[in-house]
Amino acid sequence: MAEGFAANRQWIGLEEAEELLDFDIATQMSEEGPLNPGVNPFRVPGITEKEKQNYCNILQPKLQDLRNEIQEVKLEEGNAGKRKRQRRRRKKKAFKRMMTELEDRFRKLFGTTSTTGDSTVDSEDEPPKKEKRVDWDEYWNPEEIERMLMD
């Protein structure tokens, strides 16, 4: 089976496969945190060359995707953090949508807006205004917060 791929320039060998999986694990750790970094099967203690070759055969599609992803990043070095920024923006938009939906439900249930915050959601026809940063020292006294937590 490996002989058929040898003529194909897309075939990824053992050394490159090991490096690609190391890169993938490092990327996971930097983006998602070290909670579940993954395991590189090529670095498992006691693995034989035959097992490495079998892993290489099985993982070819994933390895080729990783190689292509790395090549895209090299071509767009200025946009290396583009996906992370896009993901962050999607999450922020989803959070805003969720909060607007919760505010609407609150209005339907109680007839007024929530009194927990000073901000109220206006009609969606108006463009959103630039939000100011909140200085929490104006709203909360640290001693008062400590008393509330101790009660």
Curated annotation (Swiss-Prot):
Subcellular location: Host nucleus, Host nucleolus; Host cytoplasm
Biased composition regions of type Basic and acidic residues, renumbered to the chain: 126-136
Amino acid composition bias (Low complexity), ranges on this chain: 111-120
InterPro entries associated with the record: Envelope_glycop_lentivirus
Pfam family, one: Env-gp36
Superkingdom, taxonomy of origin: Viruses
TM region positions: none
Note on domains (UniProt): The RNA-binding motif binds to the RRE, a stem-and-loop structure present in incompletely spliced viral pre-mRNAs. This region also contains the NLS which mediates nuclear localization. These overlapping functions prevent Rev bound to RRE from undesirable return to the nucleus. When Rev binds the RRE, the NLS becomes masked while the NES remains accessible.
Name of the protein this chain belongs to: Probable protein Rev
Organism, scientific name: Feline immunodeficiency virus (isolate Petaluma)
